[in-house]
Design a protein with these regions (language model features):
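Accessory, non-catalytic peripheral segments of nucleic-acid enzymes
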Residues: 234-374
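Conserved beta-strand elements of the Class I
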Residues: 4, 121-123, 228
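Acidic/glycine-enriched edge-of-secondary-structure segments
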Residues: 18-20, 53-54, 121-129, 240-256
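Glycine-rich phosphate-binding loop signature in dinucleotide/nucleotide-binding domains
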Residues: 36-41, 147-151, 269-270
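N-terminal active-site segment of His-dependent metallophosphoesterases
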Residues: 1-68, 360-364, 368-374
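His/Asp/Glu-rich metal-coordinating catalytic cores
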Residues: 44, 55-215, 223-224
Length: 374
């Protein structure tokens, strides 16, 4: 049996507030499904959560998701998914968009469930925040106990972060993973592709299908974007890279740089690229003059001006330090549970400060926290 495993979709995400970027995510979802169907040898699709970018997706996002699902079903390819943090419903009597499609189409959720197909045991555990770690670990252990009764291949699906893979905010430690029981643990949530072994268990984050920021765009150059195909008969997997249609282009510019060469680099694409110009030892006003010349050839242009002493890695180092300082500041001033709550609230508003969906998510998170602790 050959199984396609797909990471985060984030349908509906409008990067930089641009309609073109929102459409890129829908087109990318279509690319992935078309590739799966064209292979004519995929028996099942597993999706690892964060189908939509928020728990109340637009009609366009819902339609884009359904359109591709219907293509899979026309080819009789079963589809299973788990719930990620972006579509998790925290209010009572609300239906998540994931759940909606289990009623509308012939697809199934693997939230805290397991199935056996062709002698392959597949368990899924829906997302839980760090404040619910005990409940999360209990559910993982419950699925591990069920898996122990099975003699064939065993697969676990999660939408979490493990401490060895994330600087801060991980809900699980490496020791929480039942690697001695499962042959494969596929995880959503982190957008970079990560592959590693723990004993005989392969731990794999397929990564998101599209890039949500420039860090992910740089990562695509190193690791690619796409999905995973698991061959259960051979107990092996294959990484499928599908280049994204819209390019992110990063160009270092100094006094000697040929600007005509810069213009040539960003021209000729079917989709206008997103361009970042990093100027060194150039006056900021001159940098913006240069940027103005090429702006029409870009979907979005960002300009960074640095002095000659700054290294290329300074920006990423500052990001890491700021995350670490936030962690320390919160944990020094409040309890562990309160620190987790505060950081989750920060994450909600960090993405889009003016979004009404974020306000709803923040209210739901607050209600949930105070019901549990007060």
């Amino acid at each position: 049996m050959r199984i396609a495993i797909i990471g985060d979709l984030h349908l509906g995400y409008k990067q930089y507030g641009l309609d073109d970027r929102e459409q890129d995510f829908y087109d990318r979802w279509g690319q992935i499904i078309e590739d799966i169907i064209s292979r004519q040898n995929i028996d099942m699709v597993l999706q690892l959560g964060d189908i939509f970018d928020n728990h109340i997706p637009s009609a366009i996002a819902l339609y884009a998701y359904e359109k591709q699902l219907n293509k899979l079903l026309q080819y009789n390819i079963p589809y299973y998914s788990i719930t990620g943090n972006h579509t998790l419903i925290r209010k009572q009597h609300f239906m998540s968009p994931d759940e909606l499609f289990t009623h509308l189409l012939d697809i199934q959720s693997l939230d805290d469930k397991n199935i056996i197909i062709n002698n392959v045991f597949i368990a899924g555990v829906k997302y839980r925040s760090e404040s619910k770690k005990e409940e999360l670990v209990d559910e993982i252990n419950r699925q591990a106990e069920a898996a122990q009764q099975h003699n064939g291949l065993k697969i676990l699906l999660l939408h979490q972060a493990v401490d060895v893979d994330l600087l801060y905010g991980a809900e699980l430690s490496e020791q929480d993973l039942p690697t001695h029981i499962f042959d494969y643990i596929f995880i959503g949530h982190l957008h970079s592709r990560i592959e590693r072994k723990h004993g005989n268990c392969s731990i794999i984050y397929p990564g998101s299908i599209e890039r949500s920021n420039t860090t992910e765009a740089r990562d695509e150059n190193n690791r690619g974007k796409g999905f995973i195909i698991l061959d259960t008969d051979n107990n092996s997997y294959e990484v499928i890279n599908i280049p994204c249609s819209r390019r992110f282009i990063f160009i270092n510019v100094n006094k000697e740089t040929d600007m005509e060469m810069v213009r040539e680099k960003i021209r000729g694409y079917s989709h206008k690229p997103i361009v970042e110009l990093n100027f060194k030892a150039i006056d900021v006003h001159k940098a913006h003059e240069i940027g103005h010349i090429i702006a029409d050839d870009c979907l979005r242009l960002s300009i960074n001006v640095a002095n000659e002493q700054e290294s290329d890695d300074d920006e990423e180092l500052l990001v890491d330090k700021s995350i670490s300082s936030i962690q320390n500041m919160l944990e020094e001033r409040m309890s562990k549970k309160q620190a987790v709550f505060a950081y989750e609230m920060l994450e909600i508003f960090n993405k889009n400060k003016t979004s009404s969906d974020n306000i709803d998510s923040a209210i739901a998170l607050s209600d949930d926290f105070f019901k549990e602790n007060y």
